[in-house]
Every structure is written in structure tokens, then in C-alpha cells.
Amino acid sequence: MSSHSDEIEEEQISRIEKGKGKDCQGGIETVICTSPSIVCLTQKLIAEMIGTYFIVFSGCGVVVVNVLYGGTITFPGICVTWGLIVMVMIYSTGHISGAHFNPAVTVTFAIFRRFPWHQVPLYIGAQFAGSLLASLTLRLMFKVTPEAFFGTTPADSPARALVAEIIISFLLMFVISGVATDNRAVGELAGIAVGMTIMVNVFVAGPISGASMNPARSLGPALVMGVYKHIWVYIVGPVLGVISGGFVYNLIRFTDKPLRELTKSASFLRAVSPSHKGSSSKT
């Protein structure tokens, strides 16, 4: 029984790596997503771009409003806004694209064989496009002063900011792995869990690093505003943290496989099922 299940699991993982799976409506299995495949992939990319756009627009926008209008939002309000917009976009587009919204999350899913590598550059491009468009929108809407910069820069030491980014990004991916890729989890609550994680992370690390957790979230405003101070922190930190979070959850996931098999395959349990695929997100 166990051997047969393992064979099915490996076959499902192999199909994901080759870009094969259910079509857009969860029907016939064909290459990539078909009917036709290009249309389906385009829908995913549009969903990723729109989701990332509104996450950056809302999260960064509330920062600008808070500075320009005398602190009317307050720091707790900023934290809640980030958590809510991520949750809303997961439930809005997760069933279409998987709701990554984060290049580090996309790369991590690919590393652990949860996402086809050939779609990674396209997803990352869509995410950066969404962030750039949102940043341009905010610059056009508001007179953004240097004090109202809506990107991310270390409040003190770059080293402290880097450590903070690694830790909170680790937590983010650990939660995503638990609620969105483990069949034992309640998939319908994934959006709430991820949104609350974002909110808590902003509360804790916001005053230290700005709580990015997402290279696209930081690079978009940096490019639009021309502020690149310690931008490397917001690329290295989230990537290291997210990959580490996914790897650790994979190690502690219950399985009857020996540890050497887990570290060899580095796979996330089973292939993503339609009921869980829409919840695999982040900021």
C-alpha cells in the first residue's frame, strides 16, 4: 500500500515538473493547463500581476497616506491593512494562479517541486510588473516626499534588517507550507492564516526593516522612486528566509519515509490538489 502511494506521489510530482496537470476548470489532464494552454497560463500571469498590484498599492498606499495626512492610519492600522489585502487577494485569485505574489515563494515552490520551473520567470515577471505599476500609480496619485517613501530601508543597521527579513520570511513560508501544501490542513483557512502571519510580521519587524518579505514589494518602489539604499537586504533576506522555511517544514512533515529520502527529494508531500492549489500564497 505504502509503495503504491509513493509511486502515485512521484508520478504526480513528475507531472507538475513537466507542467502537466488539470485544465483551468479542473477537468481533463493535458499539457501545462491547456484549452488552450497559452490562454490558461496567461490567465495565471494576469492574476499574479493584479494580485501583486493591489497588495503593493494598498499596503504601500496606506504608508503614504499615514505620513502625508498626519498619522491618521497609525502603525497598527498599517499592519492590519497589509494582512487584510494579502488575505483578500489570496481568496480572490488563489484558485487561478496559486496566489504567490512573491518571487521568493515562486522559486521555493519550484525548488521543492511544487511548481514547474519553466513558468518561474513568467510568474516573477508578472509579480514585478504588478509592483512597478502599483508604485507608479502611487507616485502619480500623491506628492510623495522623501519622508513618505513607501519602499523599504533599514531603520538602523543593515545587518539587523537582514536578520529580521530572514526570520519573518522563514515564518511566512513555514505557514504557507503548512496551510497550503499539507493535505491535513484546512485549506479554506489558508488565506486567513497567511494574512494574519503578514500582519504579525509587520508588527514585529516593521520598525526594524519595513517587513518586506518580498523582493517584488521592495524593488518596485525602489525603481520608481530611485531609492536603492541597502536594497540587497530585501532580496537576500526574503529569498534565504523563504527557502529555509519551506525546507524546514518539509523535514518535520509527518511521513513514513526515512530522512535521507526527504533530504534527497526535497519534495513537499504530494502534488498540489485543486482544493489546495489556490491557497499557496505570500506577499
Swiss-Prot record:
InterPro entries: Aquaporin-like, Aquaporin_transptr, MIP, MIP_CS. The chain crosses the membrane at residues 45-65, 70-90, 122-142, 161-181, 189-209, 231-251. Coiled coil: none annotated. One of its GO terms (cellular component) is membrane. The modification Phosphoserine is found at residue 267. It comes from the Eukaryota. A motif (NPA 2) lies at residues 214-216. CDD domains: MIP. NCBIfam families: MIP (TIGR00861). Potential aquaporin, which may facilitate the transport of water and small neutral solutes across cell membranes. This is Putative aquaporin NIP4-1. It comes from Arabidopsis thaliana (Mouse-ear cress). The lineage of its organism: Eukaryota, Viridiplantae, Streptophyta, Embryophyta, Tracheophyta.
